[in-house]
């Protein structure tokens, strides 16, 4: 099991912080970006860097990878995705998803840890909601109204689960403990174990007359709306925590939290890597040969760029401060303009004659038969 390869790809150790991982990712991503590095194998390296960062930038995926290696990333070791077409899902309880030795021993001996008071206040479950953002919305920030269903305290009983005018009583069978002792035959002999009370189902309370609204649960599903202020510069996969916007707590406990996860749509014009933006600019070979001043689109509007004579395909120019806002820190990243020289396909007679004259003056023989020659110099 190799659980260090992803760290090696980014050039960090296993104890690296998220800021160190992100900084290393930016460096390696720029080093192997296909538009900036034309060496053989650079694109594969770039994909490997993306794969490593996708896992190590997510705390749940990273924890699974640290423990199980590649199997933890691909297998069912928790760290679920988004729920449903609405982009909403719950995180479930706060007890975690893994069983351990305590679970094994408790199946025989009934316990193995401190007893939990069933009447103690407990925080409600956290929820997760995915927000789809347009490319420009992620760049500049936006306000979104998020509507989802969550568990709130029953408006009839106020969370007690009992019919109006009545109150829950201490369970007569378990005495309010939520568990009862049971004698069982096990492979180790006859053992006394503890199990969840079959009367109160672990709550320690009996409700003689249940609320007709929540049927004794104390909660009801309610459509809830919250305003989300999306900060400028967010990226796909980043999360935003909204405290107290999750499910209602139990026994007077606080509400859980809502985690908003951002999904940014791709642009048909730009590529983005953190705060850096890349734009492939098609350019006529005459402009590239003679030099020109051109208008370049950016997310901040068009800007003028001087192209020096003799510019080749793959040349890149930096437009300082024309990238995305830096989510941590101040200012913007840069935009990189990558030149893609276009050879004309359909030329009129005057254009052909002009190029033939240029070829002759350059000492280049052009057969016109489609063989490699003059035009290949501009590809």
UniProtKB/Swiss-Prot annotation:
CXXCXGXG motif repeat locations: 154-161, 171-178, 197-204, 211-218
Free-text remark on how the cofactor is bound: Binds 2 Zn(2+) ions per monomer.
Domain called J: residue spans: 5-69
SUPFAM superfamilies associated with the record: Chaperone J-domain, DnaJ/Hsp40 cysteine-rich domain, HSP40/DnaJ peptide-binding domain
Annotated positions binding Zn(2+) 2: 171, 174, 197, 200
The entry's keywords: Chaperone, Cytoplasm, DNA replication, Metal-binding, Repeat, Stress response, Zinc, Zinc-finger
Residue intervals of every CR-type zinc finger in the record: 141-223
One GO CC term on file: cytoplasm
Record-stated family: Belongs to the DnaJ family.
Protein name: Chaperone protein DnaJ
Organism: Lactococcus lactis subsp. cremoris (Streptococcus cremoris)
Protein encoded by which gene: dnaJ
């Amino acid at each position: 099991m190799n659980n260090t390869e992803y760290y090696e790809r980014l050039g960090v150790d296993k104890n690296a912080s998220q800021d160190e991982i992100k900084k290393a990712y930016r460096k390696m991503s720029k080093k192997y970006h296909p538009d900036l590095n034309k060496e053989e194998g650079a694109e594969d390296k770039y994909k490997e860097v993306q794969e490593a960062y996708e896992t190590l930038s997510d705390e749940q995926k990273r924890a699974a990878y640290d423990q199980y290696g590649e199997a933890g990333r691909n297998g069912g070791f928790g760290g679920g995705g988004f729920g449903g077409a609405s982009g909403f899902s719950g995180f479930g309880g706060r007890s975690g998803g893994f069983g351990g030795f305590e679970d094994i021993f408790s199946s025989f001996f009934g316990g193995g840890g401190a007893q939990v008071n069933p009447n103690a206040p407990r925080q409600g479950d956290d929820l997760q909601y995915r927000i789809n953002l347009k490319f420009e919305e992620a760049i500049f920030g936006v306000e979104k109204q998020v509507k989802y269903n969550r568990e709130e305290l029953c408006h009839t009983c106020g969370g007690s689960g009992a019919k109006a005018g009545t109150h829950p009583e201490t369970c007569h069978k378990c005495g309010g403990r939520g568990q009862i002792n049971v004698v069982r035959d096990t492979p180790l002999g006859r053992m006394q174990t503890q199990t969840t009370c079959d009367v109160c189902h672990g709550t320690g309370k009996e409700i003689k007359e249940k609320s007709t609204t929540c049927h004794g649960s104390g909660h009801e599903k309610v459509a809830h709306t919250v305003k989300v202020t999306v900060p400028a510069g967010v990226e796909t996969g980043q999360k935003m925590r909204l405290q107290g916007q999750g499910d209602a707590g139990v026994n007077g406990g606080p509400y859980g939290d809502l985690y908003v996860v951002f999904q940014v749509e791709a642009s048909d014009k730009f590529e983005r890597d953190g705060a850096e933006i890349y734009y492939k600019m098609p350019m006529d070979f005459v402009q590239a040969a003679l030099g020109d001043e051109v208008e370049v689109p950016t997310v901040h509007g068009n800007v003028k760029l001087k192209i020096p004579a003799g510019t080749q395909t793959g040349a890149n120019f930096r437009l300082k401060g024309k990238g995305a806002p830096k989510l941590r820190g101040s200012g913007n990243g840069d935009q990189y303009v990558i030149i893609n020289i276009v050879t004309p396909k359909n030329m009129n007679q005057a254009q052909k004659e002009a190029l033939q004259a240029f070829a002759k003056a350059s000492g280049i023989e052009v057969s016109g038969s489609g063989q490699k020659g003059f035009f290949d110099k501009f590809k």
